[in-house]
Regions:
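Conserved helicase/translocase motor-coupling segment
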Residues: 1-51
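Intrinsically disordered, low-complexity regions enriched in small/polar residues
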Residues: 3, 20, 97, 130-134, ...
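Alpha-helix boundary/capping residues
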Residues: 32-35, 115, 148, 168
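Intrinsic-disorder/low-complexity, polar/charged segments
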Residues: 21, 104-106, 173-176
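Alpha-helical structural motif
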Residues: 24, 28, 60, 104, ...
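Non-catalytic, charged low-complexity extensions flanking SF2 helicase motor domains
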Residues: 148-176
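Conserved RecA-like P-loop NTPase helicase motor core
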Residues: 40-41, 45-155
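Intrinsically disordered or highly flexible coil/loop and linker segments, enriched in small
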Residues: 24, 121, 170-174
Length: 176
């Protein structure tokens, strides 16, 4: 999941995977690029912009843009590069594979909203964030509500949370 879900997988042509470290990104890049029949990602171009994963001759942003323009499907691996201050309009999903419940909500939301950039070539009907740590997700949402509300009134918090979830629904898939 979610690549095993045919409906979702059609929307996941260009994705950002937020990794816990450079070594993890390097190892995952190697696994994702194995050209075996068992590898469901063998048709993806993998761009590792974590640490020394990117070539020194091009910027990480240019490397990703070039890969996207030359490939139907890409996976970008990052430990932080390209997660703030830039937009890759073609990204339709972010996979949060790093962080903890202590991950700051500002950094968390800066990263996950990378996939919400407008896209002129193909209008995005949907974009996704996949985070397999419900504690991290719910902690970030709680921090966001607390930081954007001047009161601790329970009803006001519920109203703010309801508004937030209208624009950023949070779902759980059990038994994935």
């Amino acid at each position: 999941y979610p690549f095993a879900n045919e409906t979702l997988s059609q929307s996941l042509c260009h994705t950002l995977w937020y990794m816990p470290g450079v070594n993890a990104a390097r190892c995952l890049a190697q696994m994702l690029t194995e050209q075996t029949l068992e590898n469901p990602f063998r048709g993806y171009k993998v761009i590792n912009v974590a640490g020394d994963g990117v070539s020194s001759q091009t910027s990480p942003l240019e490397e990703v843009k070039t890969a996207i323009s030359n490939n139907e499907r890409t996976i970008t691996l990052s430990c932080g590069r390209l997660t703030t201050g830039v937009s890759i309009p073609e990204w339709t999903a972010v996979f949060m594979l790093a962080g903890s419940a202590e991950t700051g909500c500002a950094h968390y939301f800066q990263t996950i909203f990378r996939c919400q950039s407008p896209y002129r070539e193909g209008m995005k009907a949907e974009c996704y964030t996949f985070d397999f740590s419900p504690v991290r997700t719910l902690t970030a949402i709680d921090q966001y509500i607390s930081n954007n509300l001047a009161t601790t009134d329970h009803e006001a918090r519920v109203q703010k949370l309801t508004e937030f979830l209208h624009y950023c629904p949070t779902i759980i898939v059990d038994g994935g």
